């Protein structure tokens, strides 16, 4: 049975939350492109791998509030907490718009706003 885009993202997020970035990357196309609006763009799986290695000092904590699937697109709205290099947890609100191709995550447009720290 073919997984829905929603199920694919849920499995990918579970992998990264468990600290398995490689399993997460298995859900991405080789030419995946991540656009963090107003910040930077990552092109290709290797660029994403390097970003994850640096940004996810510890596995992130996701709190997905809403998932909306339409055709090849999936929008995820929620909260994410990441530990920075100094060991401090930083909270963010996000809206991710994913485009899927042949059952894999091909494109991300991410709107991310820092909401505080712990």
Task: Report residues per predicted region.
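A beta-strand edge to alpha-helix "cap/lid" segment located at domain peripheries
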Residues: 1-4, 8-17, 35, 39, ...
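Short, well-ordered alpha-helical segments enriched in acidic and aromatic residues
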Residues: 18-35
